[in-house]
């Protein structure tokens, strides 16, 4: 008998089939050090027994006819193809009439013709991590021997394109590349990548007894320091404004930039489709290779562990009071400055992970990137207003491209 979640929304838990294991050693990776949480495990590999248990329970816990599996790392392709073929067999075994979709995130360096044929034949969506042109990408994305990875990533992308695999780009915006948004954007356009996520990297350093060095919200501010690779609020704001100017003039409806789509969704009062911009979070859990479930991919810390699938069901963990409180914390912990901000509806304070700054009155809990977001929202507001009006009147938001000249706002 199926166990149904008490809320009419999909239960969503990302899978980590190899935990934090990866063939790269990117300087800014927030997940690589999670392996130190599992030092007692000699092999960070998800067993077939656990794979089947998760798939059966995950599918049966859904209240929707469509089920999304997201495979994340570490580097997902360090599991052999046979593992994912077995996963699909199990998905079909337990589907019970539901439609199953799969997406997988990879650094692209291990892609082969065989992998790409599998993804194409089974309609998998592939997300590729690539930080723009070679100079930007190779600054921080190196292998364990310190050698750059760009050439291998491009070989992988070319294989995806050769086989007609649907793929998206995921780029980290850091201190080094943030000053070149158009170089970044044009690179993806030249690759023929129409769906792009630009993710700002912000991390704090706080040594822990177990060897981890990245801070969680529980680490006191006076014991942390900002990581050198972090993008600054000013850089982030300038990056978004310059990128938006280019996009809104000629690419609306052709190229999809996640943050712009999410902003427009919030502008019209719809769900933004990404937890960082939503009013509450906690809808996207993550399961490690051994069955441990955590509140969020960015909160894989001991204090945010919900339990283990061998002791508790996914429904019990994801709809637990602890997880409910985690999700509501996003809204409840907003400082007064945010609650009174004219742009609160657009960002909802962004990700709690980045809320370690102080307001002008000294109140804690302000998002470190706040100034950058405020600059962007003010800059984009007239165009968001226009696109909102088009959507409300059942017209395509892409009409904004024809109106840019007439609006004569800012410096477009």
In which residue ranges do the predicted regions lie?
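Conserved alpha-helical substructure of the radical SAM core
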Residues: 1-117, 121-123
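Short loop/turn microsegments at loop-to-beta-strand junctions
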Residues: 13, 281-283
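Conserved AdoMet/S-adenosylmethionine-binding subsite of the radical SAM
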Residues: 56, 78-197, 204-206, 210
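Radical SAM enzyme [4Fe-4S]-AdoMet core and its adjacent flexible, acidic
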Residues: 143-151, 158, 162-276, 280, ...
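Short Gly/Pro-enriched turn/cap motifs at secondary-structure boundaries
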Residues: 273-277, 284, 328-332
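Short, acidic, Ser/Thr-enriched surface-loop or helix-capping motifs
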Residues: 288
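Flexible mid-to-C-terminal extensions adjoining Fe-S/redox cofactors in radical SAM and related proteins
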Residues: 300-412
């Amino acid at each position: 008998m199926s166990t149904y979640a008490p809320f009419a929304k999909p239960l969503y838990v990302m899978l980590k089939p190899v935990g934090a294991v990866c063939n790269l050693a990117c300087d800014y990776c927030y997940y690589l050090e999670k392996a130190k949480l599992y030092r007692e495990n000699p092999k960070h590999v998800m067993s077939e027994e656990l794979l089947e248990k998760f798939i059966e329970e995950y599918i049966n816990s859904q209240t929707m006819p469509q089920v999304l599996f997201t495979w994340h790392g570490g580097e997902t392709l360090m599991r052999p193809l046979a593992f994912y073929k077995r996963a699909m067999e199990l998905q079909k075994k337990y589907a019970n009439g539901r439609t199953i979709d799969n997406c997988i995130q990879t650094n692209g360096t291990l892609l082969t013709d065989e992998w790409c044929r599998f993804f194409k034949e089974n309609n998998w969506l592939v997300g590729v991590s690539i930080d723009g042109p070679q100079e930007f990408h190779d600054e921080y994305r190196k292998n364990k021997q310190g050698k750059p990875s760009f050439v291998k990533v491009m070989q992988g992308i070319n294989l995806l394109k050769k086989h007609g695999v649907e793929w998206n780009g995921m780029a980290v915006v850091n201190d080094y590349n943030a000053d070149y948004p158009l170089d970044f954007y044009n690179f993806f356009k030249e690759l023929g990548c129409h769906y792009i996520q630009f993710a700002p990297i912000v991390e704090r350093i706080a040594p822990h007894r177990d060897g981890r060095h990245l801070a969680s919200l529980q680490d006191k501010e006076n014991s942390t320091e900002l990581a050198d690779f972090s993008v600054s609020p000013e850089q982030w704001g300038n990056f978004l404004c310059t990128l938006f100017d280019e996009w809104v003039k000629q690419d609306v409806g052709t190229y999809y930039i996640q943050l712009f789509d999410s902003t427009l969704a919030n502008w019209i009062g719809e769900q933004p489709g990404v937890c960082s911009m939503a009013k509450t979070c906690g809808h996207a859990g993550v399961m490690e290779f051994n069955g441990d479930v955590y509140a969020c991919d960015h909160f894989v810390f001991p204090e945010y562990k919900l339990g283990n699938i061998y002791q508790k069901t996914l429904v019990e963990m994801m709809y637990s009071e602890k997880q409910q409180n985690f999700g509501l914390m996003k809204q409840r912990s907003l400082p007064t400055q945010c609650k009174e901000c004219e742009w609160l509806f657009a960002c909802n304070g962004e990700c709690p992970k980045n809320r370690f700054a102080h307001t002008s009155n000294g109140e804690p809990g302000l998002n470190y990137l706040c100034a950058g977001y405020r600059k962007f929202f003010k800059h984009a507001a007239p165009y968001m207003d226009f696109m909102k009006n088009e959507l409300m009147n059942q017209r395509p938001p892409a009409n904004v491209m024809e109106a840019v000249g007439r609006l004569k706002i800012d410096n477009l």
